[in-house]
Amino acid sequence: MSVKELLIQNVHKEEHSHAHNKITVVGVGAVGMACAISILMKDLADELALVDVIEDKLRGEMLDLQHGSLFLRTPKIVSGKDYSVTAHSKLVIITAGARQQEGESRLNLVQRNVNIFKFIIPNVVKHSPDCTLLVVSNPVDILTYVAWKISGFPKHRVIGSGCNLDSARFRYLMGGKLGIHSLSCHGWIIGEHGDSSVPVWSGVNVAGVSLKALYPDLGTDADKEHWKEVHKQVVDSAYEVIKLKGYTSWAIGLSVADLAETIMRNLRRVHPISTMVKGMYGIHDDVFLSVPCVLGYSGITDVVKMTLKSEEEEKLRKSADTLWGIQKELQF
């Protein structure tokens, strides 16, 4: 008899059923691994699968995480180049793609990443036809559209990480300005994740007190306190981090884990994430932009209708036009 047989008496032969709360991360670069560790630390999955094309790096990352199993509560961590390892995932997070170079705009990355998605998405769909897709790769709004088109999934199951991080950065900077923790600072950034994002100044508040009502110049050119700079810093922050360390990873990883938690635990929290906005705010094309969405186990169930100023709506429409201009040129 083996040591195992001497030690353990079997009571019930388990059926080999698949995981119930499986999460896949596609792409094990800095962002993918930051997402993976953040998800593991939150105990959101009973199985985590990693996929990439670089096999040595992939296996190394898997082993490194497995060796930390004692300190985690995710019993199974797997990886492979073949998408069969992703089978039966509830949530698939796409971080793979060409990386943004210093000074390169997110929109410049597009066609490089479309070609990568043409390989990834059909493989994901084949093995997890009922999953929710969470796109993180940039430019995220366009690539969420691309993932939606290629996958054939209903729009509520294809989500872009969008402005969840932009809004978090905004609240962090707002907290710094006011000397209050960012959790108590409320403000929403919507629209494109990137250079043309829209800060909704009318909704910025602490404890329900509107800053715009207190100080009508907030966010305008007449503002002596330069709150507009806070939004500019949000837009510039990724470029600054990329310039200093070569890429961004931790904040986006934490932001994605925040979204994963809402989905896997069916929390129905409201997040500014990228969804199909056709028919909203006078937008007529198939574009994905961030608006406040109710998120849960089945993806996006509802959208909160924000009261926007005419110039804010105009900015959203302008973003939509820019994105559509690029999307209609894409080769699928």
UniProtKB/Swiss-Prot annotation:
One of its GO terms (biological process) is lactate metabolic process. The keyword NAD applies. Coiled coil: none annotated. Substrate binds at R106, N138, R169, T248. It is found in: Cytoplasm. Pfam families: Ldh_1_C, Ldh_1_N. GO terms for molecular function: L-lactate dehydrogenase activity. Pathway: Fermentation; pyruvate fermentation to lactate; (S)-lactate from pyruvate: step 1/1. It catalyses: (S)-lactate + NAD(+) = pyruvate + NADH + H(+). GO terms for cellular component: cytoplasm. InterPro entries: L-lactate/malate_DH, L-lactate_DH, L-lactate_DH_AS, Lactate/malate_DH_C, Lactate/malate_DH_N, Lactate_DH/Glyco_Ohase_4_C, NAD(P)-bd_dom_sf. The keyword Glycoprotein does not apply. Keywords: Cytoplasm, NAD, Oxidoreductase. The active site is at H193. NAD(+) binds at residues 29-57, 99, 138. Its EC number is 1.1.1.27. Interconverts simultaneously and stereospecifically pyruvate and lactate with concomitant interconversion of NADH and NAD(+). Belongs to the LDH/MDH superfamily. LDH family. Homotetramer. This is L-lactate dehydrogenase A chain. It comes from Trachemys scripta elegans.
